[in-house]
Amino acid sequence: MSYEPIWGAIIAWYLFLAGLGGGAFATAVFVRYRHPDCKRLMRVGRLIAPIVVIIGLCLLMFDATAGFHNPLRFVLLLTNFGSVMTWGVVFLAVFVVVALIVLVLDLMKREVPMWLDCVGLVMGLCVAIYTGCLLGVCQGFPLWNSALLPILFLVSAVSTGMAAVLLVGVFYAPDEFNEVVVMKKFHFWLPVIEFVLVAALLFITAFNPSPAGWESVMSLVSGNWAVAFWLLFVIVGLVLPTILECWMLWLAKHEFETSRTGQMISALSDAGVLVGGFMLRLLIVSAAVPITIIQPWML
């Protein structure tokens, strides 16, 4: 039996961009703390963060056609603090405001208060977690209704945020790109953790009491979404970046790692992480099968 997904690619883009924005801001804070001399790389993270989140919000607004027909629904969304979506709006609003203030201060070459960076960091991580919780509250979909999903989306958000900053940085600030070795080593482990979390999520979902859980997993690993899952997510998004970064960080000579060729190999790895981050969300949104309740009169 086939099912029409209740959400599509636009929602996947929103979830991806919102998480990436939070991860990019967290990366900028990481650079400030661990590599304070890399000002240009720090600016890249501060620039990416608000822009991609705002783009994601615009996509969400265009997709939410019902809200345009009934604007009161958006107003009510701000008053229902028992709703995950309400808290998501709060996190997003605070994050965008803080990220824009930080960006303006940076562009004006003024010192950004540490407390402001901390607020932005917390809100950015909350946004990343919220993107997983938004799906997780849908109890009728075993693939979504898991406590692992917010953790998975958080790890993926930080991974894609760092990848975006490094990918832009390799062209905008190549000298600083070679200096952030600690961040690169931290980033190396994120796709590995992501792989473990995805495997755990699929294992738990497959053994859900409802057949919908098994059908969702089979749709990913051997069904309609299998090619995208194995090729674009697993190979391009996880395996390729892990192999390339392992080569660059631990096997290649330092002269090659810091050469332009080495930088381009790292850039390819970061591009793969971004592809995998988007595919993760698209696959989870699209492959989820709802629980079907059959009434006696339907038999």
Predicted regions located by residue number:
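Membrane helical hairpin/interfacial module
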Residues: 18-91, 95-98
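Selective recognition of specific alpha-helical transmembrane segments in multi-pass small-molecule
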Residues: 50-58, 191-201, 284
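Juxtamembrane boundary at the C-terminal end of a transmembrane helix
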Residues: 280-299
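N-terminal signal-anchor module of multipass membrane proteins
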Residues: 1-34, 282, 287
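Long, contiguous internal "core" modules enriched in hydrophobic/ aromatic residues
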Residues: 8, 15-17, 35-37, 43, ...
